[in-house]
């Protein structure tokens, strides 16, 4: 699912075991046993499931049926698919047809936390942290309303936050590695704070051990399964709907909607409504688009997979105005006036042109010497327009050198070449995580080579470019048709 919270820089294997039980565990409520025994097995709904479906998923399906979330009219069901588990069509489904609806009372979001027993102690926390604690508490409780949902949640994913040191060494030199380590540090710091300020101070609400690994499990579940595009909903887990897998064939993100409708006998509620973005035949898998804007590195971090095509290959160039620059104040003012700042991040994707503001920003950062007159206040309203075109040969040559040196430095940090990685991909037989690693480092290197090629070609054109001085003379009518400067002799 889509990423739903910002991570700021964004032990061996962190595979999580089920939460351990303790002697201090609360007593089971008799009502739960009564409730559990009253689950009726609808033979028709059970026989329609593949017998290879894991038992927890079958029990989860029974629960959805009993609660009325699934009816005989529901056109999809769980199925074994290449991704593992997914939703498949029971009949032909039209593009845009509603395939499932889940009432708000089954959503897991900050509102659900606020209404729970831990609502008061979580009121001042970041939304994702409060939901993470809620997940851990509900997973521990045998009488949880969401018990059957908790039982089908994966113990881990192939997200890089769960990789071992050996596995992480395969993405040495990549931006994904530095982002992964930043995320892990961020989660660890947040856990230490919430453990001290909330968990340990409220043992009556959390009478079970919560470890860092447990917290990482909850973080990974939210990162990989939460929806974030509903009206007024920035963080929401939707049981049943989150069984839907991603596919690049889906090129829109308007599949999820919040509607009001029947949510039980004589009751109406808000519903999470999911529509099929593709036309399906019976037996086809239902797919959605998780996020069109994520790079393959984002996909690996959030979901634990990448797309095989290179369309999501990307590299982020970070540029900044140095505080030691003698024109720091003027440059910062110009940058901020034009919607940027002291530091700028430019996402460059394979096969696409450079971001439109990248070259002007580079020229601004490199501005100096005889070109510094453009920083004077008289040019303040027009300088950004001037930076959209070459300023001087020296300025243009400098930005080419700076970018090419940065690309060469980044490329030297990888322990394999493009050719070596291409060979590994062609040979195949890679484990899931190694395939992700090779795909990520290969994609980053290809983008870096693309950037280097752009500026290498620009270096070859330096003598042919028209610079500010020449443009200014033309504006004043002081350059002839052949480019020669016109001198006016006094009579």
UniProtKB/Swiss-Prot annotation:
Localization: Plastid, Chloroplast
Lineage: superkingdom: Eukaryota
Major localization listed first in the record, in broad terms: plastid
GO molecular function per UniProt: [ribulose-bisphosphate carboxylase]-lysine N-methyltransferase activity; protein-lysine N-methyltransferase activity
Keywords: Chloroplast, Methyltransferase, Plastid, S-adenosyl-L-methionine, Transferase, Transit peptide
GO-annotated cellular components: chloroplast
InterPro entries: Rubisco_LSMT_MeTrfase_plant, Rubisco_LSMT_subst-bd, Rubisco_LSMT_subst-bd_sf, SET_dom, SET_dom_sf, SET_RBCMT, SETD3_SETD6_MTase
Domain SET: 67-291
Keyword check for Ligase: no
SUPFAM superfamilies listed in its UniProt record: RuBisCo LSMT C-terminal, substrate-binding domain, SET domain
Entry EC number(s): 2.1.1.127
Record field: catalytic activity: L-lysyl-[ribulose-1,5-bisphosphate carboxylase] + 3 S-adenosyl-L-methionine = N(6),N(6),N(6)-trimethyl-L-lysyl-[ribulose-1,5-bisphosphate carboxylase] + 3 S-adenosyl-L-homocysteine + 3 H(+)
An individual GO BP term: methylation
Any coiled-coil regions, as ranges: none
PANTHER family in the cross-refs: [FRUCTOSE-BISPHOSPHATE ALDOLASE]-LYSINE N-METHYLTRANSFERASE, CHLOROPLASTIC, UNCHARACTERIZED PUTATIVE METHYLTRANSFERASE
Job description of the protein: Methylates 'Lys-14' of the large subunit of RuBisCO.
Similarity comment: Belongs to the class V-like SAM-binding methyltransferase superfamily. Plant protein-lysine LSMT methyltransferase family.
Protein name: Ribulose-1,5 bisphosphate carboxylase/oxygenase large subunit N-methyltransferase, chloroplastic
Source species of the chain: Nicotiana tabacum
């Amino acid at each position: 699912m889509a990423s739903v919270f910002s991570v700021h820089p964004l032990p061996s294997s962190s595979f999580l075991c089920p939460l351990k039980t303790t002697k201090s565990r609360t007593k089971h409520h008799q009502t739960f046993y009564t409730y559990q025994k009253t689950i009726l097995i609808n033979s028709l709904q059970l026989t329609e499931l593949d017998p290879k479906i894991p038992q927890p998923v079958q029990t989860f399906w029974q629960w959805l049926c009993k609660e009325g979330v699934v009816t005989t009219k529901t056109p999809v069901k769980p199925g074994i698919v290449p991704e593992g588990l997914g939703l498949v069509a029971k009949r032909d489904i039209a593009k845009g047809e509603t395939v499932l609806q889940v009432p708000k009372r089954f959503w897991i979001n900050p509102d659900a936390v606020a209404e729970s027993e831990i609502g008061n102690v979580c009121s001042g926390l970041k939304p994702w942290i409060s939901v993470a604690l809620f997940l851990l508490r509900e997973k521990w409780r045998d009488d949880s309303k969401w018990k059957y949902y908790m039982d089908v949640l994966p113990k881990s994913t192939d997200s890089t936050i769960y990789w071992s040191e050996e596995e992480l060494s395969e993405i040495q030199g990549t931006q994904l590695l530095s982002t992964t380590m930043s995320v892990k540090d961020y989660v660890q710091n947040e856990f230490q704070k919430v453990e001290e300020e909330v968990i340990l101070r409220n043992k009556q609400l959390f009478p079970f051990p919560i470890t860092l690994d447990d917290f990482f499990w909850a973080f990974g579940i939210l990162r990989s399964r939460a929806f974030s595009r509903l009206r007024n909903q920035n963080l929401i887990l939707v049981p049943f709907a989150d069984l839907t897998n991603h596919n690049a064939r889906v090129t829109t993100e308007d599949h999820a909607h919040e509607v009001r409708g029947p949510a039980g006998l004589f009751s109406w509620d808000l519903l999470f409504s999911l529509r099929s973005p593709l036309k399906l035949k019976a037996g086809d898998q239902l797919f959605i688009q998780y996020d069109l804007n994520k790079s393959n590195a984002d996909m690996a971090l959030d979901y634990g997979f990448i797309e095989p095509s290179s369309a999501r290959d990307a590299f982020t160039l970070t540029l900044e105005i140095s505080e030691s620059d003698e024109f720091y104040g003027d440059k910062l003012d110009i940058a901020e006036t034009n919607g940027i700042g002291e530091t700028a991040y430019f996402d460059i994707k394979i096969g696409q042109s450079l971001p439109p503001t990248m070259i002007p920003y580079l020229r601004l950062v490199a501005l100096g010497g005889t070109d510094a007159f453009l920083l004077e206040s008289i040019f303040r309203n027009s300088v950004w327009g001037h930076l959209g075109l070459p300023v001087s040969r020296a300025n243009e040559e400098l930005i080419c050198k700076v970018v090419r040196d940065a690309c060469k430095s980044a490329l030297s940090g990888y322990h394999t070449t493009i050719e070596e990685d291409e060979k590994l991909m062609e040979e195949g037989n890679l484990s899931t995580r190694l395939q992700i690693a090779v795909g990520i480092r290969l994609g980053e290197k290809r983008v870096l080579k693309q950037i280097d090629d752009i500026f290498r070609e620009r270096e070859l054109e330096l003598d042919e470019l028209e610079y500010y001085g020449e443009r200014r003379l033309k504006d004043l009518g002081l350059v002839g048709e052949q480019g020669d400067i016109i001198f006016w002799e006094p009579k």
